[in-house]
């Protein structure tokens, strides 16, 4: 039964009292402009309200934006308590919703469900695709649903822990293995961490070499269009990507966006990680990246120590305007590693899908003054000069808990549906967080609502 939101300020509402998400799945949230429904996926934890019953649930919060009510729908009960398992969403032309999700490398199944027409609260049975013939039972992680040229892709981390894809030519009713997007000899935990952005005629992506705790990553960009994998300058990398019978290229053959060790101002950036990518209708591409700032330990052997504290991360805004190369500008400090055993986790910075000049970032440093705050706060930033300078407004302030991992849900260009979760997170499997929504008209101010 739908329940009315719990208001947390003048503008902010709690729409789910137990949930969190990772950031390597998309779209994690979508708006249907016709029905004014917003859907966002999350995982419930044992530490949260009703945790004994809900722990590990793959949940969708279905929000009626017109009536300010929300309903939590369970896609899979007691699935796995891990924020890496959140579903990717896609809305079909027939009004049905598709949700796809995996475990965090603990089995080899992609799971998906399809809703009733125009009703994301009513779902058909769960179906599965077994990757094990390709992964040799080493597990699969993440789902990303993007359409290109009439074909639906589901990008996952799978074979050799490389970015791979399944394809569907029937709107997600069935799936077939396409192949690897790119590959290279494995270092440490996994290979490239990839973020995707789909447009009308191409899918753009940014990726890393490996996990930042295992490798001093650079960041690379490419795009899929016309059946070809391209570099940023449109030169071809591979004429037949996903050729299951052949081998995929290495991501180093793409265009380098940020070099490991590159300096922005007086700070050397290392161990970079992908956060978000969006492409504007005019062809401008923007990406947000996190990196360690001046983090070369005195003993080089300590650089890849898993539990060594990393005290300084930076947010980077990278951009390619039409006909030009990539530029890189600092967004500000991202703070120390969010978790002791995950030194490269941050609150994240993301891009408005309808305005690449607008970003939202979660940080314990106020970008207006540089002052450190007791908790991670959300800030909205706008640029008028391609990222060289920014004007900031606080979305949250004086918080008693951290505000983390913002999302601007696409689907309705007339509104800014800003989501984040707030609370305490000690691991991807342990958190007590609630999901917050701020829904405003695009022309409205995004200032603090508390």
State each model region's role:
Residues 2-450:
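Extracellular, repeat-based ectodomains that mediate carbohydrate processing or recognition
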